[in-house]
Amino acid sequence: MVHFVPILLDVGFTTDAAVKIAGVIGIAVILGRLLVGFAVDRIFAPRVAIAILFACICGVLALALLGSAVAVPAAFVIGFSVGAEVDLIGYLVARYFGIHAYGQIYGRQYSTFLIATGLSPVILGAVRDATGTYTASLFTAAAFMIVSAALFAKLPKFKQ
């Protein structure tokens, strides 16, 4: 989310407007964290993850293709997805691997998540500097989310 305000600046928003729109992300993160727990209690968690990824893909692609016209809804679905993904990590690790080695497995998975989260702004910025636009980075992010959704679709049912 480091680049969200610069993305909005690139599509013509003022700094003040871009920061206000980025604030929507914070609200959506909270809602994502709250609602994903409710959802996974009722719906198979990988399906919830796929739905959340699909929403985020739509938000990212809409931002890439339509720019300022969709900034607020894009901010919302991206923020919602960010909030949901963090909670899904712990839930899915517990459901698929149990609690016997939960700390070790969760720690490794979350470390990988954090490394990717830390590197992505650097890569996004480098691509922006090389191309002069965020479009390629947004399309690449959407492609990675499509791959993630396909992987979630392959997950087996939980053991009882």
Label for each model-derived stretch:
Residues 142-160:
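Multi-pass alpha-helical transporter architecture, strongest
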Residues 26-34, 83, 114-118:
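Residue-level signature of mid-helix packing/kink "hotspots" within the transmembrane helices
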Residues 65-74:
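Helix-loop junctions at membrane interfaces in 12-TM secondary transporters
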Residues 8-9, 39-40, 124-132:
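Interfacial helix-cap and linker-helix signal at transmembrane-aqueous boundaries
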Residues 97-131:
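A late C-terminal transmembrane helix in Major Facilitator Superfamily
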Residues 84-97:
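Intracellular juxtamembrane helix-capping segments at the cytosolic ends
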Residues 1-31, 120, 124:
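Extracytoplasmic gate region of multi-pass secondary transporters
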Residues 47-61:
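Structural signature of the two symmetry-related core transmembrane helices
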